[in-house]
Structures are given as C-alpha cells and as structure tokens.
Amino acid sequence: MSMVYFNILMAFIVSFVGLLMYRSHLMSSLLCLEGMMLSLFVMMSVTILNNHFTLASMAPIILLVFAACEAALGLSLLVMVSNTYGTDYVQNLNLLQC
C-alpha cells in the first residue's frame, strides 16, 4: 500500500472515529460525514487515475452529487432542529420524545 492510499485511509478512519466520538452535536456529525465523503472521493479519483479505469470515471462525480445532497439535507435538518429546540443536539432528533 502506497503512502497516498495510507493517508487517505487514515483520513477516513479519523473522520469515522470522530463521528463515533462527537455524535452529541449535529454539526460535528455532519462535518465528520463530509470528511468521510471527501476521503472516499479522493480515494476513488486516485484509484481511477492510477488504474486507468475509463468506464468508472463518472463515479467520483456521482459521489459528489450524493455528498452535496447529504450536506443540503443535513443543514436543513440542523436549521429545523435549532429553530425548534434552540440547540443542535442529536438527541433532539428522536421522534419518540414528547
């Protein structure tokens, strides 16, 4: 495994561990998810460029489209929760609470 792949994999792992550790606030969770998506995008792009996969060249762009949709939905959920409850705690997303 080259150092480029190792660094990208470590960035993904750090983002995933951050998602597991800092899941009390919605903004922290969204930032960790964006870090994971960015590392996946870079990994896919580097793999496609190194292996000359011409048929899979649209996959990173499709991943970016899904990442943008995820970010838009996450930020709209953040605005809705912060307007309703006044905080951005993930525990406020539980619909079973009264």
Curated annotation (Swiss-Prot):
Membrane topology: Multi-pass membrane protein
GO aspect biological process, one term: ATP synthesis coupled electron transport
Transmembrane segment boundaries: 1-21, 29-49, 61-81
Major localization listed first in the record, in broad terms: mitochondrion
Superkingdom: Eukaryota
Pfam families linked: Oxidored_q2
Subcellular location(s) per record: Mitochondrion inner membrane
PANTHER family, sorted: NADH-UBIQUINONE OXIDOREDUCTASE CHAIN 4L (PTHR11434:SF0), NADH-UBIQUINONE OXIDOREDUCTASE SUBUNIT ND4L (PTHR11434)
Subunit structure: Core subunit of respiratory chain NADH dehydrogenase (Complex I) which is composed of 45 different subunits.
Protein known as: NADH-ubiquinone oxidoreductase chain 4L
